[in-house]
Design a protein with these regions (language model features):
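C-terminal catalytic core of Y-nucleophile DNA break-rejoin enzymes
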Residues: 162, 171-174, 181-198
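N-terminal alpha-helical segment
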Residues: 9-10, 48-52, 114, 128-129
């Protein structure tokens, strides 16, 4: 078999990967490919460690978090390994270095006083959007889980809320066509399916 570019391999990889992952996961992969990998490496037949290291440092200098850059490299490695498996390219593991963070950001959380203020405001100025925020603040549900709730998930007599789905807006890129879609899915992990006391 002949060599292929990373762009050509990514097309075949997407077709291969699609049946095995959720639509939202595939949309995230495509977004990473289109926005980061293909503009930088799409026409390459192979990738050397130094080119990838320079790419990593450039992305971080331009404001991406280390985690976001690592996510990009995960997708890049999947494409590269798929290319090797099909004998379209050579690939050797890279030893990529990430700059250590100069300052660790402290996680900002809502104070108890502000939590109470928000709940009181929602109670005094009812709206359905406010109700969603209220449920989230009182139960710890993620916003996608709150938006995916149905009346059948709420058991008033038992005082529980059953969580077994989430809703998210995903960005779809299909050739030149780009749009967003709302997708209802199961939560990311099995432990996310749960029953919560009200």
């Amino acid at each position: 078999m002949g060599q292929k570019t990373i762009r050509e391999i990514s097309v075949a990889w997407k077709e291969y990967k699609q049946p095995y992952v959720k639509q939202s996961t595939m949309a995230a992969y495509v977004l990473i490919l289109e926005n980061h990998i293909l503009p930088n490496f799409g026409e390459s037949y192979t990738l050397y460690e130094q080119a990838v290291q320079d790419f990593v440092l450039r992305k971080i200098e331009n404001g991406l978090s280390v985690k976001s850059v690592k996510d990009i490299l995960i997708v890049l490695k999947m494409v590269m390994k798929f290319g090797v498996k099909n004998e379209w390219m050579d690939y050797q593991e890279w030893d990529i270095k990430y700059p250590s963070p100069s300052i660790t950001k402290e996680l900002e959380i809502l104070s108890v006083a502000n939590h109470k203020k928000i709940l009181n405001h929602i109670q005094n100025h009812f709206s359905f959007a406010g109700l969603g925020i209220y449920i989230s603040l009182c139960t710890g549900l993620r916003i996608g889980e709150v938006c995916a709730l149905k009346w059948s998930d709420i058991n008033v007599s038992e005082g529980t809320i059953t969580v077994n789905r989430t809703i998210e807006r995903i960005y779809i890129i299909n050739g030149t066509e780009k749009h967003t879609e709302l997708v209802i899915n199961t939560p990311k992990t099995q432990n996310s399916c749960r029953e919560i006391p009200m």
